[in-house]
Amino acid sequence: MTELKKTALHLVHEKLGARFTDFGGWDMPLKYSSELDEHHAVRNAVGVFDLSHMGEVRVTGPQAAEFLDHALISKLSAVKVGKAKYSMICTESGGIIDDLITYRLGDNEFLIVPNAGNVDNVVSALQGRTEGFDVEVNNESDATSMIAVQGPKAAQAMLEIVENVVDAPEASGAGETVAEAIEGLGYYAAFSGVAAGQPVLVARTGYTGEDGFELIVANDGAETVWTKAMDQAAQLGGLPCGLACRDTLRLEAGMPLYGNELSLKLTPVDAGLGILAATKSKDSFVGRDAIVSAKEKGTQQVLIGLAGEGRRAARGGYEVFAGDGEKAIGAVTSGALSPTLGHPVALAYVAKSAVSSGAAAEGATVEVDIRGKRFEYKVVALPFYSREK
């Protein structure tokens, strides 16, 4: 059995009494006390997460932008320095290898953040696509940590966590002072600075549906940054948070999870994210022909939101039925009792024909088989939860 990887903060989590779980080959904190308390801390105050299992892949060289236009489905050359883009890397047949965020740090420098379980596949795919491009792909994942500060009071905490602004690209919106940088930093934008004496990349990104920041730091500086982040969070009613609440937070926000809503068997079009593919502005990229074909033919399934009553949550794999029909029209991909809303919510792929006919259209009632008994769920618009802005 392969030994699980540990983040640079593992001992810190042990001292905090964390319960751990295997996630993408990493021994990660599932929760520290109550996942409900942690969830509510992020929704109402601030939560601090160790996301060091996520990958960091640096792409540099005179043709870095052109290379990523070829390797990813979006047009990365159009991203300004200081900004970031959510995109995907696909196979030639259009299957999703991973969904990822790419930061443009310079004219010829990008930082890609893939999901933990897909780092090796992403690096392999990128390196296999470098032929003909003057570019280098370096996997820095094992030397790098990521700490997320998420919630309505995240910006307030960051004012004390960040000490100096080193480089704030104009497109990022960040100003020269810490206050101007935190207040002005746009969503999906980043600047380099100093936090707790450590060089960090500060990004306004997250996976919770709340305002939030992610700090990327070298492993040897991770504990110092974590400690300062936790000190500030505690003063604002915040908590350390594990992956259990991160999952319910992202589910409420209607955000897809690789392995649940996204996979090699699905194209971006299948997942309702065909808009990410720059099929009009790019003549060629890996997977383009397959994605164009999928757009033309249309998908046979649709990702929908489901809201139930009571306390019984639908889980991944549970079948969805049109009313009292005998044949399943789809299956749940993610589901949980929503801590914020107080009722079960779920994401599910269902047949497009069921949506077109009205049987699984927004406002319709479907049934989910939960351990042999059917429960009614209403088809609702996504996201389930949206913060006030």
Curated annotation (Swiss-Prot):
One of its GO terms (cellular component) is cytosol. It comes from the Bacteria. Gene3D superfamilies: Aminomethyltransferase beta-barrel domains, Aminomethyltransferase fragment, Probable tRNA modification gtpase trme, domain 1. GO terms for biological process: glycine decarboxylation via glycine cleavage system. It catalyses: N(6)-[(R)-S(8)-aminomethyldihydrolipoyl]-L-lysyl-[protein] + (6S)-5,6,7,8-tetrahydrofolate = N(6)-[(R)-dihydrolipoyl]-L-lysyl-[protein] + (6R)-5,10-methylene-5,6,7,8-tetrahydrofolate + NH4(+). Its EC number is 2.1.2.10. GO terms for molecular function: aminomethyltransferase activity; transaminase activity. Keywords: Aminotransferase, Transferase. It is an enzyme of class 2 (transferase). The glycine cleavage system is composed of four proteins: P, T, L and H. Belongs to the GcvT family. The glycine cleavage system catalyzes the degradation of glycine. NCBIfam families: gcvT, PRK00389.1. This is Aminomethyltransferase. The gene is gcvT.
